[in-house]
Amino acid sequence: VANQYGGNQNLEAIEFFKHLNSVLTGRKDGCMIIAEESTAWPKVTHRPEEDGLGFTFKWNMGWMHDFLEYMKLDPIYRKFNHNHMTFGLTYSTSENFILVLSHDEVVHLKCSMINKMPGIYEDKFANLKAGYTFMLGHPGKKLLFMGQDFGQFHEWDEKVSLDWYLADEPLHADLQSYVRGLLTLCLLYTSPS
């Protein structure tokens, strides 16, 4: 249904988000409003005064898709697909992005992060370390889902606990230590804003 200007934007919804986000961010209590938005709607994280929607952050769905496609490839074929890893840099400053590897990517037969990686057992861990290192160096805030830090093998299931015993296995413990080190570097060398 066309709006009063002939477009297909829901003008009332736009005004609702602008108002809601202005009120919430105006409280100055540390509230973050994060948009999971996949349509390339412009200015999601810009202030309403700049004709933005006023969200604090936006999931970078394009980066996530490209990252996962690249990381699933056998390393011998990656040299033909580096564009998957570099394209996100062309728009990385257009919004306040969060690089998300969410629950959506480790359910419904999509595999856990470690099982998305190519290669034999040890190679999977090396590939995931390389991927996380790239992620930490890419512009945007970072968000891993539970179990991704130690190499959870099973897909996420809200009815079942994580396989915490894996964190005691050498390669899993090493991955967890590696992620801890990456996050420590991130805290030391990035601004809090």
Model segments located where?
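Catalytic cores of secreted or luminal carbohydrate-active enzymes
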Residues: 171-188
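Conserved small/polar residues in nucleotide/adenosyl-binding loops
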Residues: 189-193
